[in-house]
Amino acid sequence: MFLGYSDCVDPGLAVYRVSRSRLKLMLSFVWLVGLRFHDCAAFESCCYDITEAESNKAISRDEAAFTSSVSTRTPSLAIAPPPDRSMLLSREEELVPWSRLIITKQFYGGLIFHTTWVTGFVLLGLLTLFASLFRVPQSICRFCIDRLRDIARPLKYRYQRLVATV
């Protein structure tokens, strides 16, 4: 496995062993990334909820201003006429796209959050599978060990000469 020791028992069957500390570290990293995406999605939905509440307050303020202006223009004994029906319909039509937008944003925010988790785990699984099948850790370790030996040989001889002269 890419994160630890891997061994192929049978051809085509990969058995990997991961140390618990590395597994915990990896899972906590994936959990934190997912939590960050969840916070972003929740923040967006909160923003849209606040925007919807503010638009509702603005509409109720407009209605209050409209009724107060109508009542101040009419004599005190007369009943104020009902608000214009076309104005109310246009306000309702303005609210419909907002509510649809909020639902759409919440849906896609949750969808993005869950697809991120699933995609992350699938990619991690494929990475570990291919790393164990092609013995990537062993080849990387062999390469590093060979390079370290190449570097260490001259240093070893220099150290031996230095010790011999002293």
Curated annotation (Swiss-Prot):
It is found in: Host cytoplasm. The keyword Nucleus does not apply. The keyword Cell cycle does not apply. GO terms for cellular component: host cell cytoplasm. Keywords: Host cytoplasm, Host-virus interaction. Disulfide bonds: none annotated. Interacts with host IQGAP1. May play a role in rearrangement of cellular cytoskeleton towards an efficient viral assembly and spreading. This is Protein UL5. The lineage of its organism: Viruses, Duplodnaviria, Heunggongvirae, Peploviricota, Herviviricetes.
